[in-house]
Curated annotation (Swiss-Prot):
It comes from Sus scrofa. ATP binds at residues 215, 220, 239, 313, 344, 375-376. Its main location: cytoplasm. The lineage of its organism: Eukaryota, Metazoa, Chordata, Craniata, Vertebrata. Its cofactor is Mg(2+). The modification Phosphotyrosine is found at residue 196. AMP binds at residues 215-216, 220, 239, 313, 344. Belongs to the phosphoglycerate kinase family. The modification N6-acetyllysine is found at residues 11, 75, 86, 97, 131, 146, 199, 267, 291. (2R)-3-phosphoglycerate binds at residues 23-26, 38-39, 62-63, 65-66, 122-123, 170-171. This is Phosphoglycerate kinase 2. Pathway: Carbohydrate degradation; glycolysis; pyruvate from D-glyceraldehyde 3-phosphate: step 2/5. Essential for sperm motility and male fertility but is not required for the completion of spermatogenesis. One of its GO terms (molecular function) is ADP binding. GO terms for biological process: gluconeogenesis; glycolytic process.
Length: 417
């Protein structure tokens, strides 16, 4: 799957056309008010581009939360998003009470020029995801002919299709792969994601460094293996490191994370690294706690000293930070996925913060720095570094699957150039 050879919105002729656009308006709400409008703001350049270039209408579709294929307008309606979008765009937004069916089709058939229309939550229909469950917890499965009808109805709402929801690109949902129109383009958010991941996966600058944190080795096996075919250096940190250090150095790890399943392939991973001449750096010292709590008693440990029984490592220590800084300084391209410690608690945030500072420094010297979504993106928000790195991905699961070497259905479905 090529990331760089897909039709993009700037190459799509939208003049006089109805644009149906998949966006990610899955935003936090409290009492029917949007509490963080970041994702809505992020979609504005694509929406405005269509309007400025003479689109007849822009029909927006999104999911919100997990209604699991059941209509729950009291809890998961996108109606409050329409109000927020109206104030951000400075123009009226027509909200429709459903995303498919005759009323939606009629409203979108012949709209006044320059209309912006927001459809109700796609996931109120089990046909969007293909499966779900009812309020009593019984599993629901969509019938194939109904999925087809759902997709056909969505396809009637526009003349051209734009996908700007990278965060859902790893899901083969109806709105991602089932809108059957001749031209399907990526919006500007999606394009930025694909451009940056193409830089990493299709033609990387070197030395190329991957920094992998997070907890379980088993969850990251595919990621580590795929990246070992691409990078020159790798840092393995976070909770994942203890499984490696126990197997490779016979380190005493106390009550720190040990992943039995992951342990069985540590040697295979190291052999692959050696074969590919990839230099892997592990932590050498740690900040430890007598229990997994924010206000725990704090201590220090090294790989050599081991971690005392009952204690748990929750961050890497100052010597590790120095080692990592040297590795980062050598790189021309960095992909970072997963924090190095329990960064949510200040006592255990120093390792992740120190690394973030080094990555910001590297970026200012011309290194390309890509932050995978999820927790690592949260770190950027926490320390206000979103504008100080090259790219912060909006898709946790989607970016992880790309880095694992998987094909993303939502990208695959776009028109090829």
């Amino acid at each position: 799957m090529s990331l760089s050879k897909k039709l993009t919105l700037d190459k799509l002729d939208v003049k006089g056309k109805r644009v149906i656009m998949r966006v990610d308006f899955n935003v936090p709400m409290k009492r029917n008010q949007v509490t963080n409008n970041q994702r809505i703001k992020a979609s504005l350049p694509s929406i405005r581009y269509c309007l400025d270039n003479g689109a007849r209408s822009v029909v927006l579709m999104s999911h919100l939360g997990r209604p699991d294929g059941v209509a729950m307008p009291d809890k998961y309606s996108l109606e409050p998003v329409a109000a927020e979008l109206k104030s951000l765009l400075g123009k009226d937004v027509l909200f429709l009470k459903d995303c498919v069916g005759s009323e939606a089709e009629q409203a979108c058939a012949n709209p006044p020029a320059g209309s912006v229309i927001l459809l109700e939550n796609l996931r109120f229909h089990v046909e969007e995801e293909g499966k779900g469950q009812d309020p009593s917890g019984n599993k629901l499965k969509a019938e194939p002919d109904k999925v087809e009808a759902f997709r056909a109805s969505l396809s009637k709402l526009g003349d051209v299709y734009v996908n700007d929801a990278f965060g859902t690109a790893h899901r083969a949902h109806s709105s991602m792969v089932g809108v059957n129109l001749p031209q399907k383009a990526s919006g500007f958010l999606m394009k930025k994601e694909l451009d940056y991941f193409a830089k990493a996966l299709e033609n990387p600058e070197r030395p190329f460094l991957a920094i992998l944190g997070g907890a379980k080795v088993a969850d990251k096996i595919q990621l580590i293996k795929n990246m070992l075919d691409k990078v020159n250096e790798m840092i393995i940190g976070g909770g994942m490191a203890f499984t490696f250090l126990k197997v490779l150095n016979n380190m005493e790890i106390g009550a720190s994370l040990f992943d039995k399943e992951g342990a069985t392939i540590v040697k295979e991973i190291m052999a692959k690294a050696e074969k590919n001449r990839v230099n892997i750096t592990f932590p050498v010292d740690f900040v430890i706690a007598d229990k997994f709590e924010e206000n725990a008693k704090v201590g220090q440990a090294t790989v050599a000293s081991g971690i005392p029984a009952g204690w748990v490592a929750l961050d890497c220590g100052p010597e590790t930070n120095k080692k990592y800084a040297q590795v980062v300084a050598r790189a021309k391209l960095i992909v970072w996925n997963g924090p190095l410690g329990v960064f949510e608690w200040d006592a255990f945030a120093n390792g992740t913060k120190a690394l973030m500072d080094e990555i910001v420094k590297a970026t200012s010297k011309g290194c390309i720095t890509i932050i995978g979504g999820g927790d690592t993106a949260t770190c950027c928000a926490k320390w206000n570094t979103e504008d100080k790195v090259s790219h912060v991905s909006t898709g946790g699961g989607a970016s992880l699957e790309l880095l694992e070497g998987k094909v993303l259905p939502g990208v695959e479905a776009l028109s090829n150039l």
